[in-house]
């Protein structure tokens, strides 16, 4: 018996089509209907009166409350002065990924050694303002400075030893970088 290849292919396809039509896999989908939804509970909506607003004239909405007394705020020395014990920095020592803490909020900052503007490119990841605007960084002596897209300083930090930097943002928020 001599069978041609095309005849064998035709018989195989016919068998495949016939077997596909006889399956019951798809017929069971038509028989099952979803369970009916339970009706939402019927109830009555009630309303209450809002408390009356503060009496007019008792407070002036345009005035801020007085600042609390005896507050202690940590600060860095004025610009250009490094804290005692701060070490000289190099770009290689700063390059990498840092865990940043800005006023108690955490994020990550990447500081690769890719040249960008007057320093190196930087990339914040899920950072709060103003640190979310970091575009570059550079070191000068003992100081690490983080810059925005216009070259304005967003934060100045100094090495606190090991793999840690402490400083403050341009608006006075404390910031630290750790690895």
Swiss-Prot record:
Residues 24-88, 158-179 are annotated as: Disordered. Residues 1-20 form the signal peptide. A lipid is attached at residue 21 (S-diacylglycerol cysteine). It is a lipid-anchor. One of its GO terms (cellular component) is cell outer membrane. It is found in: Cell outer membrane. PROSITE patterns: PROKAR_LIPOPROTEIN. A lipid is attached at residue 21 (N-palmitoyl cysteine). Pfam families: Inh. One of its GO terms (molecular function) is endopeptidase inhibitor activity. Keywords: Cell outer membrane, Lipoprotein, Membrane, Palmitate, Signal. InterPro entries: Inh/Omp19, OM_lipoprot_Omp19_bac, Protease_inh_b-brl_dom. Belongs to the rhizobiaceae omp19 lipoprotein family. This is Outer membrane lipoprotein omp19 homolog. It comes from Mesorhizobium japonicum (strain LMG 29417 / CECT 9101 / MAFF 303099). The lineage of its organism: Bacteria, Pseudomonadati, Pseudomonadota, Alphaproteobacteria, Hyphomicrobiales. The gene is omp19.
